C-alpha cells in the first residue's frame, strides 16, 4: 500500500449488510465513510443556496496567505457570504500549491495529457451504490459544481489496471528457478495477489482492516461514536505503524474495550514484504515510523476508497468546456503582474475553477472581484512578517516581486483577520511573528507546527506512446518493486490525446531522499535504465519499456526542495497526535483573540489529501462568520459544530 492505495471496503460496508446505528437527528451529522473527528457534514453547510452565511460586516478586512486549494476555497466561500474586502497573497506566479498539474507539451495549443506532480487521486467519500459526485464530501461538491470530468484511478492491484507486476528480491519471490515478475490480475476487484507469501500478508491486512471498518461503520456518528473514537485514539496514538503491523492480532473484538482492535500479527518476514511492496500494490515503508493513526484514518475512513483521476473541466474529447479566460493571452493580478493562465485540464482545473468561475450569489468570480481592487490578488509576493497591532488588527508585511530580488519592494497592509494556509515549515523559516501574546498564540501551538514531520516525495513523469496501453500485452500496466524506483504507474486520460503518461518512479521519505543528489536528467535516465533492467531480468517479461517512453520530455518534482512547499505532506510521529489535533482546535480556541486562522493540510491529521484543505478553509470561514456576527444559513449555529477532542 502507498498513501493512495485502494481499499474500497469502507464504501461497500453499508451496502453489504453491516449493522449501522442511526445517527443523531442532527442534520449536520456526517455519515460513513468520512473522517472520524467531528462527524460533521461540511457539504451540507456549503452546498446551501447563498453558502455558509450572510455577512453583516462585509467590510471586515481579511487576508489569505497562500493561493493553494485551501486559500482559494476560503476566498470563494467568504466571497459567497458577502465579504468583499479579501486579499489573497501568493508567493509564486501560479495558483494551486501542491496541486501541480504540468502540461506534458508546454508549448502545444492542443489538449493533451498532463502530469500530476502533486496530488493525483481523489476520494469523493461516496458509497458503492452512488456516483462519486454524490459523496458527502467537499471534493464531491466542487467536482459537481464545476462539471469536472473524472475516471477511476489506475491504482496498482486494482481492477482499473489490466495487470500489476510485482518484483521483489530480484524476482526470487515465488520460488521459481529463474527470476520472475509476479502478475496480479484483479478484474473483479476482489482477487487476492499471487503467491503464498503475498496472500498471507494480504489476509492479515484484510482481516484487521475489515473488522475495524465493520465496527467503526456501525457506530459512526451515533451517540456512542465519540467515546469509541477516543478509545481508538488512546490505544493507538503512541503506536507506530511498524509496531501495529507486528502487534498480535485479536481473536475477537470486545465491546467492553471498544478502542482495541489489536494489530495485524505479521511475522518479521511478512512485515518486510509489507514494508517493501504492501500487498503487491505499493510500499508502506515510508510510513512505517509515523503514528499508526494516520494509515488507519487513510484506510478505514474512506480516503482510499474508489479513488478518482481528475481529467479537468473537459468534454468527452478531452477538450476544455467553455470557461473563463480559457483563451486569454494572459491573466493578471491586482497589480498587473501576470501569472499562469488557466488550462482547465487535470486536477489544476479544480483550483482554476475556484478562482475564475462565477458565483451565483455575486454574478462574478473571485478573480474578477479581486481585479476590481488594488490589493485583491497579489502574486509573486512573499509574506515576511505578521505583526499584532494595539488596535487588534494584524499588519501583514510582504515582499512584492519576490522572484526578482533586485526589484523586490516591501509593502504592508492591515487586516482584521488573517488566514494562514502555508506548510508549517514555511511559516517557521519565512515569517516573523511579532506582538502575539500567549493568550493569542501559545508556545504549545508554535511548537506543534514547528515539530510537525513533513514527508519528502519525488515523482518522475514522462510521455508514454499510445501503443503501450493499446497493444502491449506483455509488460504489466502497473509495476511495484523494492528497487529505488519503487512504484510505476501508466494510465490514459483520453483516446484523443496524442500520448499517455508514465509515472516512472514514485517515492516517499527515505526512498525519495536517497535520490536527491542526482540531477533531474540523471535521475530520469537512471529510472528508465533500472526499469528496463528489471523487466529484462524477469524471465516471464524479457522486454524493455524505454522504447515507449519520451525520456527527453520527462519532468521531475522534488517537494522537499520546492521553495513554495518544503515538503509534500505533513505527518505526525507516535506520541504527537494530540499536538496535531491541537492545531485543528486553534481557530475555535484562540483565533477570535489573535485574528489568526490556521487552515489546510498543514493543520490537519489527514496528510497528503485535498479534503482536509477544503475543510480547513471552511472551518476558518465558519469562525470568521461567527466572530463578525454573520447570519448562518439553514438554521446552523455554532452549537451544531462539534469540538475537536484532546486527551481527557
For the regions a language model picked out, list residue spans one by one.
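Mobile amphipathic helical/loop "lid" adjacent to a hydrophobic cofactor/ligand pocket
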Residues: 2-13, 24, 140, 144-146, ...
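Conserved flavin/dinucleotide-binding core of flavoenzymes
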Residues: 3-49, 81, 393, 413, ...
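Glycine-rich active-site loop/strand segments that organize a redox cofactor
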Residues: 5-15, 97-136, 157, 220-231, ...
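N-terminal glycine-rich phosphate/pyrophosphate-binding loop and immediately adjacent elements
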Residues: 53-221
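Short, solvent-exposed loop/turn segments at secondary-structure junctions
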Residues: 69-70, 93-94, 106, 122, ...
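Mid-to-C-terminal "cap/lid" subdomains and adjacent gly/pro-rich loops that border
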Residues: 147, 161-231, 372, 421, ...
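Active-site/ligand-binding neighborhood in enzyme catalytic cores
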Residues: 217-385, 389-394, 400-404, 414, ...
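Mid-domain catalytic core of redox enzymes
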Residues: 379, 384-503, 507-510
Amino acid at each position: 500500500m502507498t498513501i493512495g492505495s485502494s481499499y474500497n471496503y469502507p464504501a461497500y460496508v453499508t451496502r453489504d449488510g453491516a449493522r449501522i446505528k442511526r445517527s443523531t437527528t442532527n442534520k449536520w451529522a456526517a455519515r460513513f465513510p468520512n473522517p472520524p473527528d467531528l462527524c460533521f457534514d461540511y457539504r451540507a453547510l456549503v452546498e446551501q443556496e447563498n453558502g455558509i452565511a450572510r455577512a453583516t460586516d462585509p467590510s471586515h478586512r481579511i487576508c489569505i496567505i497562500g493561493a493553494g486549494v485551501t486559500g482559494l476555497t476560503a476566498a470563494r466561500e467568504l466571497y459567497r457570504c458577502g465579504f468583499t474586502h479579501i486579499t489573497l497573497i501568493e508567493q509564486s506566479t501560479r495558483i494551486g500549491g501542491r496541486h501541480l498539474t504540468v502540461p506534458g507539451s508546454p508549448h502545444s495549443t492542443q489538449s493533451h495529457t498532463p502530469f500530476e506532480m502533486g496530488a493525483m487521486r481523489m476520494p469523493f467519500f461516496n458509497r458503492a451504490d452512488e456516483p462519486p459526485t454524490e459523496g458527502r464530501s467537499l471534493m464531491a461538491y466542487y467536482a459537481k459544481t464545476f462539471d469536472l470530468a473524472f475516471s477511476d484511478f489506475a491504482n496498482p492491484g486494482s481492477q482499473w489496471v489490466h495487470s500489476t507486476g510485482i518484483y521483489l528480491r530480484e524476482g526470487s519471490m515465488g520460488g521459481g528457478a529463474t527470476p520472475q515478475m509476479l502478475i496480479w490480475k484483479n478484474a473483479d476487484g476482489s482477487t487476492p495477489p499471487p503467491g503464498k507469501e503475498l496472500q498471507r500478508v494480504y489476509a492479515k491486512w484484510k482481516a484487521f482492516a475489515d473488522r475495524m471498518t465493520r465496527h467503526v461503520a456501525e457506530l459512526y456518528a451515533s451517540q456512542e461514536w465519540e467515546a469509541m473514537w477516543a478509545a481508538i485514539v488512546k490505544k493507538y496514538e503512541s503506536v507506530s505503524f511498524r509496531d501495529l503491523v507486528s502487534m498480535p492480532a485479536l481473536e475477537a473484538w470486545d465491546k467492553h474495550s471498544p478502542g482495541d482492535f489489536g494489530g495485524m500479527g505479521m511475522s518479521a518476514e511478512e512485515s518486510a514484504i509489507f514494508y517493501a511492496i504492501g500487498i503487491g500494490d505499493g510500499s508502506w515503508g515510508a510510513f512505517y515510523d509515523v503514528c499508526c493513526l494516520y494509515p488507519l484514518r487513510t484506510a478505514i475512513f474512506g480516503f482510499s476508497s474508489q479513488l478518482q483521476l481528475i481529467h479537468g473541466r473537459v468534454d468527452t474529447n478531452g477538450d476544455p468546456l467553455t470557461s473563463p479566460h480559457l483563451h486569454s493571452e494572459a491573466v493578471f493580478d491586482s497589480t498587473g503582474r501576470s501569472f499562469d493562465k488557466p488550462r482547465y485540464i487535470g486536477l489544476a482545473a479544480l483550483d482554476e475553477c475556484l478562482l475564475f468561475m462565477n458565483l451565483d450569489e455575486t454574478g462574478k468570480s473571485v478573480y474578477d472581484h479581486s481585479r476590481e481592487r488594488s490589493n485583491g490578488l497579489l502574486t509573486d509576493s512573499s509574506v515576511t512578517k505578521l505583526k499584532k497591532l494595539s488596535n487588534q488588527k494584524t499588519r501583514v508585511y510582504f515582499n512584492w516581486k519576490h522572484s526578482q530580488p533586485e526589484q523586490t519592494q516591501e509593502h504592508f497592509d492591515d487586516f482584521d483577520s488573517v488566514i494562514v494556509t502555508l506548510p508549517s515549515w514555511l511559516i517557521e523559516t519565512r515569517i516573523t511573528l511579532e506582538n502575539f501574546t500567549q493568550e493569542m498564540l501559545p508556545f504549545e501551538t508554535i511548537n506543534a507546527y514547528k515539530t510537525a514531520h513533513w514527508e519528502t516525495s519525488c515523482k518522475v513523469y514522462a510521455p508514454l506512446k499510445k501503443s503501450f496501453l493499446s497493444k502491449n500485452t506483455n509488460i504489466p500496466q502497473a509495476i511495484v518493486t523494492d528497487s529505488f524506483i519503487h512504484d510505476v504507474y501508466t494510465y490514459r486520460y483520453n483516446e484523443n490525446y496524442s500520448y499517455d503518461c508514465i509515472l516512472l518512479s514514485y517515492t516517499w521519505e527515505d526512498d525519495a531522499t536517497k535520490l536527491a543528489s542526482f540531477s533531474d536528467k540523471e535521475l530520469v535516465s537512471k529510472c528508465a535504465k533500472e526499469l528496463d533492467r528489471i523487466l529484462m531480468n524477469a524471465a516471464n517479461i524479457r522486454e524493455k519499456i524505454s522504447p515507449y517512453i519520451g525520456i527527453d520530455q520527462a519532468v521531475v518534482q522534488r517537494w522537499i526542495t520546492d521553495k513554495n512547499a518544503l515538503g509534500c505532506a505533513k505527518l505526525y510521529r507516535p506520541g504527537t497526535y494530540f499536538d496535531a489535533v491541537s492545531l485543528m482546535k486553534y481557530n475555535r480556541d484562540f483565533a477570535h483573540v489573535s485574528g489568526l486562522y490556521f487552515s489546510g493540510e498543514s493543520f490537519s491529521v489527514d496528510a497528503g489529501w485535498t479534503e482536509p484543505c477544503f475543510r480547513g478553509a471552511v472551518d476558518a470561514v465558519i469562525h470568521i462568520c461567527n466572530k463578525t456576527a454573520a447570519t448562518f444559513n439553514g438554521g446552523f449555529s455554532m452549537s451544531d459544530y462539534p469540538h475537536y477532542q484532546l486527551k481527557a
